[in-house]
């Protein structure tokens, strides 16, 4: 969503006394070039959910709550909560994020990809932030995605019938992004 939408949403929830819960399960953990996607708009949520990137593929989820919410003993029960291996993995992920500057890399490489993708004729619209990018076409992308995977050996996601989603690893380099651009042009 646009920054304007996020600001209006935050204002509306505050005026109405409604808790703002943001799902950052896919868009969080550096994917958009900020640690959480909603940080681009400068708003603060009451609750933020996260998973996926939190433990680099090991099953784990978490949430952050505003200090306005006070924990109550016995309020939360969970079968798998506090898994030691998951917690150790999550700490290691944060250490690697900092050491390898993965959030900054996602921002930098994502900006490069967005700029280059917008130059390609035949793509109706390119949108996104960081390494969470969508390319919209005027036609169904099923055959294009098939050519990408079978002829160019490039895996992409889809959203609807006319949208290709790009969610590459946060370690993607500019050179690898350029290789993708070359292969995409060949498939087009």
What are these regions (language model features)?
Residues 1-188:
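Conserved N-terminal phosphate-binding loop of PLP-dependent enzymes in the Aspartate aminotransferase
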């Amino acid at each position: 969503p646009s920054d304007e939408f996020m600001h209006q949403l935050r204002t509306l929830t505050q005026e109405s006394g409604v808790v703002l819960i943001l799902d950052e399960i896919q868009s969080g953990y550096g994917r958009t070039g900020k640690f959480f996607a909603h940080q681009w708009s400068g708003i603060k949520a009451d609750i933020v959910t996260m998973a996926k990137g939190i433990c680099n593929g090991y099953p784990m989820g978490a949430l952050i709550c505003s200090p306005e919410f006070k924990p109550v003993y016995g309020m939360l029960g969970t079968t798998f909560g506090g898994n030691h291996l998951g917690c150790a993995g999550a700490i290691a992920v944060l250490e690697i994020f900092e050491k390898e500057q993965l959030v900054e890399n996602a921002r930098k490489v994502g900006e490069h990809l967005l700029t280059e993708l917008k130059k390609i004729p035949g793509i109706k619209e390119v949108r996104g932030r960081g390494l969470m990018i969508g390319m919209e076409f005027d036609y169904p992308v099923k055959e294009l995605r098939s050519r990408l995977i079978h002829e160019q050996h490039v895996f992409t996601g889809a959203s609807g019938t006319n949208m290709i989603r790009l969610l590459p690893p946060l370690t993607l380099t500019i050179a690898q992004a350029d290789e993708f651009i070359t292969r995409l042009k060949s498939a087009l």
